């Protein structure tokens, strides 16, 4: 099968771990320092269910509830990773606002999305429950994962699940449609 190219945008509030998830996925390492992103791109070859993909990731600058949705991320993207930190209720609220804006800008009712609750290694500081995350993802018909970029927990699954959702949207169902919850 010929290799397919898929463009994925990482979005969410500041400091939730978007860059760390990209770096962990692409380079297999965790950098314990904080350098706010303006915009960064990463490329990785991934194989899912015998299909090779060139995954182009765009790591966006953190957004907040007042940000205007950056229109450039609504065009030529196949899917989105919306990230919050399980230690920040604010980041959970912001991800809901980003999702609404995304649908609005794209003029669509459905967009392939994986909702990610990151930083699960900081479980003692958790303020967003797994149940809240799951419910939100179900309401979006999105996949849901809790991850740790630091401990490399479920990071690869984000991109595998998103590639499957994108494939399903393109009329090539490889898995049962509907909500993918792990
Ligand atoms: N404990 C823990 N810290 C994390 C994790 N992921 C990221 N961090 C830390 O959180 C801080 C912010 O991480 P970034 O990856 O820069 O976050 P970002 O969402 O890209 O931030 P912006 O560029 O401002 O949007 C850094 O100090 C990271 O080391 C994680 O899974 N666990």
From Swiss-Prot:
Post-translational modification Cysteine methyl ester, affected residues: 179
Membrane-protein topology: Lipid-anchor
Gene Ontology biological process terms from the UniProt entry: apical protein localization; carbohydrate homeostasis; cholesterol homeostasis; G1/S transition of mitotic cell cycle; insulin receptor signaling pathway; lipid homeostasis; multicellular organism growth; negative regulation of autophagy
Binding-site residues, Mg(2+): 19, 37
SMART domains on file: RAB, RAS, RHO
Lipid-binding residues (covalent, S-farnesyl cysteine): 179
Motif placement: Effector region: 34-42
Positions of the pro-segment in this chain: 180-182
Reactions accelerated catalytically: GTP + H2O = GDP + phosphate + H(+)
EC numbers on record: 3.6.5.-
InterPro entries reported in the protein's UniProt record: P-loop_NTPase, Small_GTP-bd, Small_GTPase, Small_GTPase_Ras-type
Positions that bind GTP: 15, 17-20, 31, 34, 37, 118, 121, 149
Gene Ontology MF term list: GDP binding; GTP binding; GTPase activity; metal ion binding
Subcellular location: Endomembrane system; Golgi apparatus membrane; Cytoplasm, Cytosol; Endoplasmic reticulum membrane
GO CC terms in record: cytosol; endoplasmic reticulum membrane; Golgi membrane; plasma membrane
Main location (coarse class): membrane
Highest taxon in the source lineage: Eukaryota
Assigned keywords, A-Z: Cytoplasm, Endoplasmic reticulum, Golgi apparatus, GTP-binding, Hydrolase, Lipoprotein, Magnesium, Membrane, Metal-binding, Methylation, Nucleotide-binding, Prenylation
Family: Belongs to the small GTPase superfamily. Rheb family.
Function, as annotated: Binds GTP and exhibits intrinsic GTPase activity. Activates the protein kinase activity of TORC1, and thereby plays a role in the regulation of apoptosis. Stimulates the phosphorylation of S6K through activation of TORC1 signaling. May also have a role in activating TORC2 signaling.
Protein's UniProt name: GTP-binding protein Rheb homolog
Gene: Rheb
